[in-house]
UniProtKB/Swiss-Prot annotation:
Pfam families: Chorismate_synt (PF01264). This is Chorismate synthase. It catalyses: 5-O-(1-carboxyvinyl)-3-phosphoshikimate = chorismate + phosphate. Pathway: Metabolic intermediate biosynthesis; chorismate biosynthesis; chorismate from D-erythrose 4-phosphate and phosphoenolpyruvate: step 7/7. It comes from Burkholderia mallei (strain ATCC 23344). InterPro entries: Chorismate_synth, Chorismate_synth_AroC_sf, Chorismate_synthase_CS. GO terms for molecular function: chorismate synthase activity; FMN binding. SUPFAM superfamilies: Chorismate synthase, AroC. HAMAP family: Chorismate_synth (MF_00300). This reaction introduces a second double bond into the aromatic ring system.
Length: 369
């Protein structure tokens, strides 16, 4: 399994399985001299951890992070940073009934066909549990980006199933378990999830992520374009089946006279490009949306096959998220931050001394509609 590392200069390699003794990651390339404590990382992990509301898995994992290396006297040294998160609430017996059967919609069948061996306990390596160390690494990336460039990476749930969630204010996001930017709609979301759980079914979600303050110039054409790497990272999140940058698929129905973001001396007039042109950041907000599929682990009986190829019926029991999108916001934020810090370092390495006589215009013109 050779695809466990993300990044070029700032790299993150994750390890562990859902029901193993621990999960974690090794971060290489973090700049030295940044103040860092376990509490800095824990703040982000607490936003993602399970068991925080009745609408998510009731697996009770404290997700307490340990920094094993790369930090001395509270400061990063430039050496690899190892983060460890111990698993404490595994219930492997819940998965005994699927040891010989493939769960529809999961990685069971493909992992078995590719590797010839499968850890069926909670999905093993393919579990969304492995997003915890990604969030830990993302906490470090977000801190460096904020302190070095003033970049803020924030996200929110913009749709739960067929329920669209109009954006009201960022302050609402941290006040509810859905990361919804609209407090008035939360009771409707709660009723929706309660009915879904009663039916033994699941649903998908859309998450929007915004990075503000990214300078113009980040991105490495042709094949490491900033938006290409963002899409690559977002598709590495469990259950993500679609990624949009800026207007995304809405661009199909837009005319060039609408979609093209005009430039004026006072700033850009629009941001349909989502903050990236030619694979390089424009200085505008980078806007990303991801589509998350419904959880495959549901109580409704589903047809499948056994390892011997015989027909079978699968009913999934245990502790599962009826919508994995509810906890996906900090994960998507972390992925975007990891791509941005990597490109910040790559830009500094090759083009740090480049200057242009053309003034850098504002992210948005004052009179832009």
């Amino acid at each position: 399994m050779s695809g466990n590392t993300l990044g070029t200069l700032f790299t993150v390699t994750t390890f562990g399985e859902s029901h193993g003794p621990a999960i974690g990651c090794v971060i290489d390339g973090c700049p030295p001299g940044m103040a860092l404590t376990e509490a800095d990382v824990q703040l982000e992990l607490d936003r993602r951890k399970p068991g925080t509301s009745r609408h998510v898995t009731q697996r009770q994992e404290p997700d307490q992070v340990e920094i094993l290396s790369g930090v001395f006297e509270g400061v990063t040294t430039g050496a690899p940073i190892a983060l460890l998160i111990r698993n404490t609430d595994q219930r492997s017996k819940d998965y005994g009934n699927i040891a010989e059967t493939f769960r529809p919609g999961h990685a069971d069948y493909t992992y078995w066909q590719k590797y010839g061996v499968r850890d069926y306990r909670g999905g093993g390596r393919s579990s969304a549990r492995l997003t915890a160390p990604v969030v830990g690494a993302g906490a470090i990336a977000k801190k460096w980006l904020r302190e070095r460039f003033g970049v803020e990476v924030r996200g929110y749930m913009s749709a739960l199933g067929e329920i669209e969630i109009p954006f009201v204010d960022w302050s609402h996001v941290r006040e509810n378990p859905f990361f919804a930017p609209n407090a008035d709609i939360v009771p409707q979301l709660e009723d929706y999830m309660d009915a879904l759980r009663k039916d033994g079914d699941s649903i998908g979600a859309r998450i929007d992520v915004v990075a503000s303050g990214v300078p113009v110039g980040w991105g490495e054409p042709l094949f490491d374009r900033l938006d290409a790497d963002i899409a690559h990272a977002m598709m590495g999140i469990n259950a993500v089946k679609g990624v949009e940058i800026g207007a995304g698929f809405a661009s199909v129905a837009q005319r060039g006279s609408v979609h093209g973001d005009e430039l004026t001396p006072d700033g850009f007039v629009g941001n349909h490009a989502g903050g990236v042109l030619g694979g390089i950041s424009t200085g505008q907000d980078i806007t990303v949306s991801i589509a998350i599929k419904p959880t495959s682990s549901i109580r409704t009986p589903r047809r499948s096959i056994t390892r011997a190829g015989e027909p079978a019926v699968v009913e999934t029991f245990g502790r599962h998220d009826p919508c994995v999108g509810i906890r996906a916001t900090p994960i998507a934020e972390s992925m975007l931050a990891l791509v941005l810090i990597d490109h910040a370092l790559r830009h500094r390495a090759q083009c740090g001394d480049v200057s242009s006589a053309t003034p850098r215009i504002a992210a948005r013109a004052p009179d832009a509609q």
